[in-house]
């Protein structure tokens, strides 16, 4: 029984960020390799249940930009990339480099460089081990009970406003139903800021104009509507704070961009 509870908690913690207090991954008694293995299993489940987009142009762009960001990160993960056909304005990267982008975010991005900014941010969460750290935090605070309660709430579609969204939220059982719903929502504010900074460097290193990261958040703010706005930014730092931080960090990112062997600027427009 104890083993089953630990396995359940681990599956949730891959993507469900439960708290923001600090602790060390070592305290969790789990290695980066172990959590990457569990993330890979969850990703396979997502792929088996989600509707993969048949938009060849967007799929090729996601693949291309993801590969460039992955290379810029310097991590030798077993990278995988998918484009999910869904209305969510969202993207995520599981531990170990398992990336998903939703078609709903593509029209908001407008440019290839903006996609690089989003992917840079999400990949940074993985490379900075934020998922592993949150597993450690949860274990330290004995969240077994909360994990079980969360599992029983799968399918509740807590963040969804439409029937289609509620249906999509159930995809992939534990990982896609409960975990992915909260993946973007429960990183600490400090984690989000760190991912913004590191992600801006990744996009610049990959050859994309880093100032587009600032314009991206202007467009994301403009895209908000109804209750809560896009999932991708719903609990992230405020738009003004985020743009201010990215502007402050821009000189360092511009230096990375100038040193990049390939410069794509804004890249292709997203149509």
Regions found by a protein language model. Give the residues of each.
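Bacterial N-terminal signal peptides that target proteins for export
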Residues: 1-9
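Hydrophobic helical h-region of N-terminal Sec-dependent signal peptides
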Residues: 10-18
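A Zn2+-metalloprotease active-site environment signal
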Residues: 17, 21-271
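Sequence-pattern detector for short linear motifs
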Residues: 9-10, 245
